[in-house]
Amino acid sequence: MSDKTPRKPTAFRLEQPARVSAASEQEEPRRPRAVKDLEQITPQADVFDLTDDEAAELEILDPAFEAPERKGWSLSRILFGALGILVSFAIGIWTEDLIRALFARADWLGWTALGVAMVALAAFAAIILRELVALRRLASVQHLRKDAADAAERDDMAAARKAVDALRTIAAGIPETAKGRQLLESLTDDIIDGRDLIRLAETEILRPLDREARTLVLNASKRVSIVTAISPRALVDIGYVIFESARLIRRLSQLYGGRPGTLGFIKFARRVIAHLAVTGTIAMGDSVMQQLVGHGLASRLSAKLGEGVVNGLMTARIGIAAMDVVRPFPFNAEKRPGIGDFIGDLARLNSDRNARK
């Protein structure tokens, strides 16, 4: 053990480190004072942006598509049907007389003509069958559109599932819809309201197609606008607008899974033109455009560039009408494109071209 006596407990005063208050570190607030000669930046409005009133007027000329009611036999249908039967009889009699004459001249000529006639008949039957299948597919798309709208309005889950299954069948060959179809297939056993199921199918399956369709419409409108601006004759403008519009209609129908044949394309184009005629925008010219945008847009461009914008907008209008006709579901969850979505791009395209000259 140690000889040292233990130290008695003693109280000690500890030296506390100096604390710097946060308030002292802060600088004193600057007294308010007047500042002069500030540099003011005034934003310039885009001359090609539409006001709310102008956009509303554009939307009035761009109503949604409503499928016309199917009418009975008309006089024009009876006329063309009777003429078609007469032409078929004439071709048949002419072919028979030709084969008989060839048999009278030489047997091998007659048999050759008969074989060629059989091949032509088989090819004609195959073409007719393909066209009938395409027409049936186009009709099924129109019926599906009505069924989907009715199921969403009544919030019918059974009808909605039936419409979604039909949509998945139509979009089965479209790679862009694979992810959406897989998602909807995984929800087969889930309980979902009919209206929500229709909106979900529209978002997951048709949204990628809508995005690509808008790109097709915008590119076609730009091409028409440029060709109109540089073409020397109005006949060239009209011809190219018709060509580009026909190609746009066919590409949109193929995009949404319609795949129309020749007769189906003609019927589809008639529906698009009828939709345009009902809205009264197929004859929209430069004077109408000046009234439409308050004498603003067309007056800011030269006459030729203004014609390019008008023809480009007409092509966009045809593309929007084609989307209305061929889209399997009506626009519900997704926003329907309008003319206002394309007018700014077309005007800027032509103004940039004018600035480079």
Swiss-Prot record:
Keyword list, A-Z: Cell inner membrane, Cell membrane, Membrane, Transmembrane, Transmembrane helix
Keyword Acetylation among UniProt keywords: no
Signal peptide: none
Membrane topology: Multi-pass membrane protein
Pfam families in the cross-refs: DUF697 (PF05128)
Regions of compositional bias (Basic and acidic residues) in chain numbering: 27-36
Transmembrane segments: 78-98, 109-129
Region (Disordered): 1-36
InterPro entries, sorted: DUF697, UPF0283
GO annotations of cellular component type: plasma membrane
Location in the cell: Cell inner membrane
NCBIfam families xrefs: hyp_HI0043
Similarity remark: Belongs to the UPF0283 family.
Protein name as catalogued: UPF0283 membrane protein BMEA_A1074
